[in-house]
């Protein structure tokens, strides 16, 4: 698939920022290939890292995040696999990180293990669309 390289600033909700050169596949191109069902409204990313440890009730404890189709199709939203002309380091989200340049860092899922297209978050963990959203953060973390 075609790739995109972009130099952008990462803004953290904690107040720090940094600039990096990211390369990856535009998420919009991937969505065009899979042809989402009409009822799909959100792109949900499940990640390899666990935030809560094992749960007794069988819930998935892995980090997860979501964006809507407008952000998913934005030209700067990519599934990044390179950072600064090198393979993406584990510390920065390898094997795959979703870069959503119009939103704060907590919306940019690292260690992506799977991608789902969903209509609702109602049955996914806390029902708010992401790990931090379930903890009280806003669902749209725009900058």
Where do the protein language model's features map onto the residues?
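Structured, non-membrane catalytic/scaffold regions adjacent to prosthetic-group chemistry
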Residues: 1-143
């Amino acid at each position: 698939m075609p790739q995109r390289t972009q130099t952008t600033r990462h803004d953290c909700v904690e107040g720090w920022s940094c600039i990096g050169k990211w390369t990856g596949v535009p998420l919009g191109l991937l969505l065009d290939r899979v042809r989402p069902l009409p009822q799909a409204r959100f792109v949900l990313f499940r990640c390899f890292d666990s935030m809560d440890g094992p749960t007794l009730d069988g819930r998935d404890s892995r980090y997860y995040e979501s964006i809507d189709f407008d952000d998913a199709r934005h030209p700067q939203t990519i599934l990044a696999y390179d950072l600064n002309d090198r393979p993406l380091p584990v510390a920065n989200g390898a094997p795959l990180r979703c870069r959503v340049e119009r939103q704060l860092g907590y919306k940019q899922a690292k260690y992506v293990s799977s991608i789902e297209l969903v209509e609702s978050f109602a049955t996914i963990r806390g029902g708010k669309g992401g790990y931090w959203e379930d903890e009280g953060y806003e669902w749209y973390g725009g900058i």
